[in-house]
From Swiss-Prot:
Region called Disordered, residue ranges: 187-206
InterPro entries documented for this protein: MADS-box/MEF2_TF, MEF2-like_N, TF_Kbox, TF_MADSbox, TF_MADSbox_sf
Organism: Brassica oleracea (Wild cabbage)
Domain MADS-box: 1-61
SUPFAM superfamilies assigned: SRF-like (SSF55455)
Name of this chain's protein: Floral homeotic protein APETALA 1
Function (record text): Transcription factor that promotes early floral meristem identity in synergy with LEAFY. Displays a redundant function with CAULIFLOWER in the up-regulation of LEAFY. Required subsequently for the transition of an inflorescence meristem into a floral meristem, and for the normal development of sepals and petals in flowers. Regulates positively B class homeotic proteins.
Gene designation: AP1
Keyword terms of this UniProt record: Activator, Coiled coil, Developmental protein, Differentiation, DNA-binding, Flowering, Nucleus, Transcription, Transcription regulation
GO biological process: cell differentiation; flower development; positive regulation of transcription by RNA polymerase II
GO cellular component: nucleus
PANTHER family reported for this sequence: SERUM RESPONSE FACTOR HOMOLOG
Complex formation: Homodimer capable of binding to CArG-box sequences.
Single annotated GO MF: protein dimerization activity
């Protein structure tokens, strides 16, 4: 007796329903992989559980490429067959399309951050790992490039500073040489001017004979001879003139 046809209906037991979902999902993904390998077809499979968890399978490492291709194809086909009265409907579909795309991007972002990985299959985890490795390679390459450019810029600035320092040192040495030469020249000039100057000429003071006649008369002793100290016996004025005649004249007047 052959096996009867099993009636499909919702499994009421939650545990049995979850177990059946896991088994059927694995079988479905296996069939999708087989058809992609045997027939060289691009397959994208998206499954949501009763709790809202997303399960997907794609032959391309990036699911978005297949979805974008599907969206372009279906949107272009709808545009060809849709009448003008369905413009509002098209806008609604466009909104739903963009909303689904945003949700997909948010989910991928969570995966890149290491979140919501429990529902991913080994192949999905492998694809995610490859994407992260590729991203890390690009990040390291860009970081090394920036570091290399920064080092080159610092070396260029260092070279410019060294050249500027060399130029300043050269200018300072030239200035020191000029100042040293000027100092030597000044020292030579000052040495020539510091020699003892010749004595200034004596200024001769000429006294008027009237002033000489009114000079105090020498002291006379009554009844004696004129006596005068030896140092005053001969006086000479600034004109080297002997005062002896004047004194003799004065003595003659007193004798009279």
């Amino acid at each position: 007796m052959g096996r009867g046809r099993v009636q499909l209906k919702r499994i009421e037991n939650k545990i049995n329903r979850q177990v059946t979902f896991s088994k059927r999902r694995a079988g479905l993904f296996k069939k999708a992989h087989e058809i992609s390998v045997l027939c060289d077809a691009e397959v994208a499979l998206v499954v949501f559980s009763h709790k809202g968890k997303l399960f997907e399978y794609s032959t391309d490492p990036c699911m978005e490429k297949i979805l974008e291709r599907y969206e372009r194809y279906s949107y272009a086909e709808r545009q060809l067959i849709a009448p003008e009265s369905d413009v509002n409907t098209n806008w609604s579909m466009e909104y739903n399309r963009l909303k689904a795309k945003i949700e997909l991007l948010e989910r991928n972002q969570r995966h890149y951050l290491g979140e919501d990985l429990q529902a991913m299959s080994p192949k999905e985890l492998q694809n995610l790992e490859q994407q992260l490795d590729t991203a890390l390679k690009h990040i390291r390459s860009r970081k090394n490039q920036l570091m290399y450019e920064s080092i080159n810029e610092l070396q260029r600035k260092e070279k410019a500073i060294q050249e500027q320092n060399s130029m300043l040192s050269k200018q300072i040495k030239e200035r020191e040489n000029v100042l040293r030469a000027q100092q030597e020249q000044w020292d030579e000039q000052n040495h020539g001017h510091n020699m003892p100057p010749p004595p200034p000429p004596q200024q001769h003071q000429i006294q008027h004979p009237y002033m000489l006649s009114h000079q105090p008369s020498p002291f006379l002793n009554m009844g004696g001879l004129y006596q005068e100290e030896d140092q005053m016996a001969m006086r000479r004025n600034d004109l080297d003139l002997s005062l002896e005649p004047v004194y003799n004249c004065n003595l003659g007047s007193f004798a009279a």
